[in-house]
Amino acid sequence: MHNYLDFEKPISDLEGKILELKKLAGEDESVNTSDEVARLEGRVRDAMMEIYSKLSPWQKTQVARHPSRPHFLDYAAELFTEFTPLAGDRNFANDDAIQAGLARFRGAPVAVIGQEKGNDTKSRIKHNFGSPRPEGYRKAVRVMEMADRFGLPLITLVDTAGAYPGVNAEERGQAEAIARSTEMCLNVKVPIVTVVIGEGGSGGAIAIATGNRVYMLEHSIYSVISPEGAASILWRDSTRAKEAASNMKITAEDLKSLGVIDGIIPEPVGGAHRDPQAVIGRTGTVIADALKELSGRNGDELRADRRQKYLNIGRNL
């Protein structure tokens, strides 16, 4: 059962008819619906191609937030072996919104950091809907330090609406934790490959996203603030989020043209949630190619190039 977005009504109507026909055929073996099902499946493919070829920025935002979209732990299970997560910041607590640890990627040791949103009510609460607290960013710093110490390439997967803005998080130094994580991400002398797999929201995303190579999935978004947040600030009206999204340059195509990211990873027609295995496989290939390209560079060069990359972004935008 799919969770349909509001602009997917033509698809939901067609797939509803397909389910009815299959149910009818299952109840009465004398009824042959295969030809009609095949015809409707063709119409579904055509409808998805048409709809997804011209998504608006707000529609892409909805796809990036789709509840069935694969999250960090889905990628970790498929891309990495021997993934050993670290827990805690050695100061206050553990934060499950940030998953970080050591693993093997195609046989080679790596360090891995990502935000996890969860996929049901219980896990979403556990992972705080992917909005990290200060402890999460301090845990990320721990893993970055380990990667730097042992010369491990660092892979980061970004998927957050933003860092948690609660009073307790602010009291424990949320801004400092984000700044420290960003600083460490810029300073390590190992290759960093970053992929925005869903939402890339504000400093909560950039804290683990200052990679030598940064990629976005086709229907992911990346911005300094959510469309709702921008609408609330600009017009005091969060219901104008659609209008804000259209003016914020948040899509992968926009950010590639602005030089913020290095490449776009295609998604299956209908979004990553339609075929998680395919998009995870493509992501793995892109990461492997990027690490191979960066492998011949020394640590000082990697760090200098990364710093220059983000200085250029600041100057050019």
Swiss-Prot record:
Residues 40-293 form the CoA carboxyltransferase C-terminal domain. GO terms for cellular component: acetyl-CoA carboxylase complex. Disulfide bonds: none annotated. It holds the Pfam family ACCA. SUPFAM superfamilies: ClpP/crotonase (SSF52096). Acetyl-CoA carboxylase is a heterohexamer composed of biotin carboxyl carrier protein (AccB), biotin carboxylase (AccC) and two subunits each of ACCase subunit alpha (AccA) and ACCase subunit beta (AccD). This is Acetyl-coenzyme A carboxylase carboxyl transferase subunit alpha. The lineage of its organism: Bacteria, Pseudomonadati, Pseudomonadota, Alphaproteobacteria, Hyphomicrobiales. The gene is accA.
